[in-house]
Swiss-Prot record:
Source species: Xanthomonas campestris pv. campestris (strain ATCC 33913 / DSM 3586 / NCPPB 528 / LMG 568 / P 25)
Reactions accelerated catalytically: XMP + L-glutamine + ATP + H2O = GMP + L-glutamate + AMP + diphosphate + 2 H(+)
Signal sequence interval, chain numbering: none
EC number: 6.3.5.2
Designated name of the protein: GMP synthase [glutamine-hydrolyzing]
Pathway(s): Purine metabolism; GMP biosynthesis; GMP from XMP (L-Gln route): step 1/1
Amino acid sequence: MSSLHNDKILILDFGAQYTQLIARRIREIGVYCEIWAWDHDPSEIAGFGAKGIILSGGPESTTLPGAPVAPQEVFDSGLPVFGICYGMQTLAAQLGGATEAADQREFGHAEVDVVAADALFSGLTDHAGASRLNVWMSHGDHVSQVPPGFTITAVTDRIPVAAMSNEDKRWYGVQFHPEVTHTLQGQTLLRRFVVDVCGCQTLWTAANIIDDQIARVREQVGDDEVILGLSGGVDSSVVAALLHKAIGDKLTCVFVDTGLLRWQEGDQVMAMFAEHMGVKVIRVNAADRYFAKLEGVSDPEAKRKIIGNLFVDIFDEESNKLANAKWLAQGTIYPDVIESAGSKTGKAHVIKSHHNVGGLPEHMKLGLVEPLRELFKDEVRRLGVELGLPRTMVYRHPFPGPGLGVRILGEVKREYAELLAKADAIFIDELRKADLYDKTSQAFAVFLPVKSVGVVGDARAYEWVIALRAVETIDFMTAHWAHLPYDFLGTVSNRIINELRGVSRVVYDISGKPPATIEWE
């Protein structure tokens, strides 16, 4: 590990939905951290070399037998400890205090009164003339009695212990969630713990991460050649830019143009990487193969498999032509790493598997290069900007691995894909013009394989239907449909119907997630 990783925080995950958010907040402060499951081998804690430990929230109850606990090594380590929500409850229960189940859960906005100043709370307030903070609560149980040596530092009118600390041991606990933006002073509390109490330097910045990764990649691959599957998505684009900076023309990218990409995306990828940045890119025009394989297939899962498997076959064919390649680069990011670790312990909440392209075949005897595997998505984007990629590319909306293949309901045909790509481009173009693109989390068009009656000139015509979908979400686990202005939707509809032959009707999807998923298939 480089000096960038010397000052770091360990987060033990008790299964809360907010755990990754804690890690992202600490990274934003400029400090490296990792998430381990609460039942990770405790003998590895000392070797990890953290400057402090955070115990996350979780869905369990400390009042029930068999509840998850922090390993004794946490308290024997001499390190500062910060328990959040369930983390504070287990801190209290394990150190000689008491917790109890409440009659009802407390969820949402709350106000806490700071009753004793410590290293975290000293001087903080959200209310003039009162030591009161606006926070976000999400708990059932609460601490009813603090352990020996602890002081109550905050209370609410509903619970006797909203925060507690043992300053001699540098152990702290809060019942609320400082990582959520609704807790107005949350980032200050985390910064005070990580920087002031734990003494971490803030070295985790985009520029330092790039320098560190360049050094690590050069050390890993030496003079060998590396291949990368370039999709045009954010992760693979940032990997391409980073590796090009590290090893220059020892990197070869394979870009498979499936015919299921965004409008003119193949040309844009080539212009960006091959022409503008000088990256070696092999473009494989595979649309004919994809449409042939997809003919007559309407089941979404079958379509996904065909699209994923064909990508692997084509990538395999191309990599076999590159006899000197010893390494395969991939855009694996930290949430992928956490997810596979979580599914091993069985304790962490398993998140729905996403449509990343299927795994590459076992027989490809290549070493793996994964320069983004320590990074969250927002960090990957910041790296992209730092590397000089256009902001419009780095911050664009997610696009599914199978591309338009899962946005054309039922059978996929070339004519459908071309119509849909153009309709989608019109929608995105208008969103950007109206300054609405960055206000939505994801927006796209869907091709519906049904014909609807319309009037063209004086004649009736049966033509296709395009659905528009736009959502607002923080984490893509839940989403609200975006309340786009009617005039705006009218403009988009008029353009699609007037500019695209074969479309007579445009509809807007007003379903939330749940019950609907964001994508239609």
